[in-house]
Amino acid sequence: MKKNNIILNDNEIDISKSDPNSSLLDWIRLEKQLHGTKEGCAEGDCGACSILLSPVNGGKLRPANSCLLKLGQVVGSSVYTVEGLGSKKLPSPIQKSLTKYGGSQCGFCTPGFVIAITSLLNHKEKPTEIDIHDALAGNLCRCTGYRPIVEAIEKIDGDIPSIFSIASTICLLYTSDAADEHTG
């Protein structure tokens, strides 16, 4: 990976012409035109702006609040938005289950829940109800309530695609390239 790049939904992107001080959320929505990631509270409390982020050091992907991060902070990282996890034509098992079992009404908060659930299920194959509640603690929903969301998670059918090993490999390659660049 090049020095001023990030991986966004498996695509390497040069961000050298973007403002490193803009919020990651604004960059995702305004420059990349990915509107699944939303601004709810702009304080990191609601989960509407959630993305999956893998640090440069190759650590595991974790949910992060894109409204609290500057674009310059994620150089060398892998970032996944809800668009990188599924689509209208090919929804992920999580998206299918939320739709099928009434885990979404207006849909504003749904992308954040999909991010949180994806992270949970990639770290824990058979989560308990307590695990599910813990994973969803940073997400707010004003319409559906939480019971249908939890029930939809418990009924997910199908393999959850693991994007974690791919992102870790990409980040390790970036770290190696950066080390080579500095050591000549």
Label for each model-derived stretch:
Residues 174-184:
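Single conserved hydrophobic/aromatic residue that forms the stacking wall/gate
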